[in-house]
Amino acid sequence: MKKSKFLSLATIISLILLTFSFSFAFDKIKFVAISDPHISIPQQKGVTDGYKLGLKTQMLTENTVAEINKIPDLKFVLVAGDLTQDAEPWNIDELRKILDGLKVPYFVTLGNHDLSRVPHEKKDQPITLSKYTVAGAFIGRSGGMVPGMTYYSHEVAKDLVLITLDTSRAQIFVPEAGLNDFGARIDPGQMRWLENTLKANQKKTIIILTHHSAVPWCEGDKSNHNAWRWFWMDNAEEVRALLKKYGVKLVFSGHRHISTRYQQVDDIYHFVHPALSTYPMRYTVYEMTPKDLSWQVKDVPASPEVWELAKKNFLADKWWRGPDHTETPEGNQKYLEFYESPATLKGKLTYK
């Protein structure tokens, strides 16, 4: 009788522990997010140091990888798109070589600079690589990526699933904007795939990795100042509704070139990440549990001369300035504060 009671008690305890382990499959996990390296080999014709430090992108990305490799207990790295200058094969090869130097797995998503621009009679466009070819370069490195697909899912830890999205539209030159279309939309086929993937992973924690945001980051993004409406998805409301339906909490993006910060919309936390290639040149270290997320933003290692050049070129640029970022001391300060975001260099949130 005593033995029977003991076995029953042991069974109950085992079931409780098993349930607990399934509910919280990962206890704490550390990872890094980087974005917009815009790799361009310095010897490439036409590469310069402008707003994007084209001649320095190789060095800046190498330095970042070296620093990331010093982080203890790191599990993986996320790369939020705009991998290259404009999908040049030599730049893809170079980025692959640099990222392969990471000591942990890395996972990429594609940005608007990772597909070939469409030739236009009013603007010469070099023919570079198809986005399917760019994505294919990372098969075997970004787990879950398969031939013929530009988006994928992968279980990066027990019951922690990464879902990457391909947000970019065709790179068609838009004469009235004087720019290639760098906007975003999740097409119907990808939306169906996303819902099926979310449905299959309802009991797991989800991280969405995308280049374009599903939210605007300033009034200029909403009002289409300098074509800034292209910084976030055309069908953002539809995408957010689907993510909310399946209880997604975290969406990580790049593209906007502003320092790390987040918005909470419908209980979803939308994070944006700075570029490695433009001022303020940063990456972000995260620690995550099933209940909360903390982060710390780090500067990319570079010489004082490089930092001075990056800031000088940043301040000289007009296109990236918002409507209230006038070329005055006060306007410059607002411009710097918006991109640097000193109040969000570190933080912690608990999911609702």
Stretch-by-stretch model annotation:
Residues 64-76, 161-163, 175-269, 321-345:
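His/acidic metal-ligating clusters that form di-metal
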Residues 289-352:
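A short C-terminal boundary segment appended to hydrolase-like catalytic domains
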Residues 24-89:
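N-terminal active-site segment of His-dependent metallophosphoesterases
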Residues 89-200, 244, 266, 270, ...:
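Extended active-site neighborhood of metal-dependent phosphoesterases/phosphodiesterases
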Residues 35-61, 116-138, 171-186, 222-230, ...:
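Acidic/histidine-rich helix-loop elements
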